[in-house]
């Protein structure tokens, strides 16, 4: 079965009670102000069709979903051995901002989708790009076909004011020789990436390349190679949802990436990308209603990569 507006609308109504069950991220003050009852879903097919329900057009802070975009940019700038010598490909099983594992593993982050891994990727972008923050913004605008997408400067400033732990992660990696630039400028870029403000529709369109062997459905241009697309989806399936990746694979069965802003993107390779948003989170930092919505959609349209 194909996804339809009626299917999405029925799922939204079914999962709506969960919006009052989770907890909105409060360690970033600007995120804590987002109403917990927001709920949206968008599907973007490889034929270019957009199907939506709920608050799918409303922009929100994409947070860690941006880590996939940073990795995609880095894949185009570095040879695989260069890239993967500085960050691993394994699930962490720890909190996304853990220092303990990083210390034990001598400054090499487990994967690019936890904070340490994404900060290393931003360090790598800083080494190869003259203006990485502007390049990322142009990249997202191009992939989505939406030139008005921007950074939420209030969120970025809020994160920078509460950046002690991420700074500690960066300095710890630098002490092991796995950080090559000044810490503060790299953190500024990292927080701006997290503060990208996008809607479910914009996210689903942006990540269409992961459902289409590395080619953007929006632009028709090759973003990454088919092999890199497959590898990225493999990492999303194993590492994309913090320490809830196994639960998500079990329930939803799609490569995915979440953010503490309540967004999740999911990929059905060869067919479609899906974006959901509901700010109330579970204990792993993943959207409670969003995960359930994706689980129901996967069941109703009969899709899973497994």
Curated annotation (Swiss-Prot):
Residue sites binding substrate per the record: 64, 115, 159, 166, 190, 242, 260
Any coiled-coil regions, as ranges: none
Keyword Hydrolase part of the UniProt annotation: yes
InterPro entries associated with the record: Beta-lactam/transpept-like (IPR012338), Glutaminase (IPR015868)
Any Pfam family hit: Glutaminase
Record GO biological process: glutamate biosynthetic process; glutamine catabolic process
Taxonomic superkingdom: Bacteria
GO molecular function: glutaminase activity
Keywords, in A-Z order: Hydrolase
Swiss-Prot/TrEMBL catalytic activity: L-glutamine + H2O = L-glutamate + NH4(+)
Keyword Hydrolase recorded: yes
Enzyme Commission identifier(s): 3.5.1.2
Matches recorded under NCBIfam families: Gln_ase, PRK00971.1-1, PRK00971.1-2
Subunit organization: Homotetramer.
Family the UniProt entry places it in: Belongs to the glutaminase family.
Protein name: Glutaminase
Species for this entry: Vibrio cholerae serotype O1 (strain ATCC 39315 / El Tor Inaba N16961)
């Amino acid at each position: 079965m194909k996804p339809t507006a009626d299917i999405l609308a029925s799922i939204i109504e079914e999962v709506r009670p969960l919006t009052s069950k989770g907890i909105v991220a409060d360690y970033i003050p600007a995120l804590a102000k987002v109403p917990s009852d927001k709920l949206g879903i968008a599907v973007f097919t490889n034929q270019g069709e957009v199907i939506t329900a709920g608050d799918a057009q409303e922009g929100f802070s994409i947070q860690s979903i941006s880590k996939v975009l940073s990795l995609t940019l880095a894949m185009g700038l570095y040879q695989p051995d260069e890239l993967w010598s500085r960050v691993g490909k394994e699930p962490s099983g720890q909190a996304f901002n853990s220092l303990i594992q990083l210390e034990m593993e001598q400054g090499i982050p487990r994967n690019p989708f936890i904070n340490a891994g994404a900060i290393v990727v931003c360090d790598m972008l800083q080494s190869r790009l003259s203006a990485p923050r502007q390049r990322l913004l142009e990249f997202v605008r191009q992939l989505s076909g939406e030139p008005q997408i921007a950074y939420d400067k209030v969120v970025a400033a809020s994160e920078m004011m509460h950046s002690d732990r991420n700074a500690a992660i960066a300095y710890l990696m630098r002490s092991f020789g796995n950080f090559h630039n000044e810490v503060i400028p790299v953190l500024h870029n990292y927080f701006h990436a997290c503060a990208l403000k996008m809607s479910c529709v914009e996210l689903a369109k942006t990540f269409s390349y992961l459902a289409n062997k590395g080619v953007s459905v929006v632009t028709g241009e090759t973003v990454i190679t088919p092999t890199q697309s497959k590898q990225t989806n493999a990492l999303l399936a194993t590492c994309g949802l913090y320490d809830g990746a196994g639960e998500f694979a079990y329930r939803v069965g799609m490569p995915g990436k979440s953010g503490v802003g309540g967004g999740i993107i999911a990929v059905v390779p060869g067919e479609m990308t899906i974006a959901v948003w509901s700010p109330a989170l579970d204990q792993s930092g993943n959207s409670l209603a969003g995960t359930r919505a994706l689980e129901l959609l996967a069941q109703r349209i009969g899709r899973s990569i497994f």
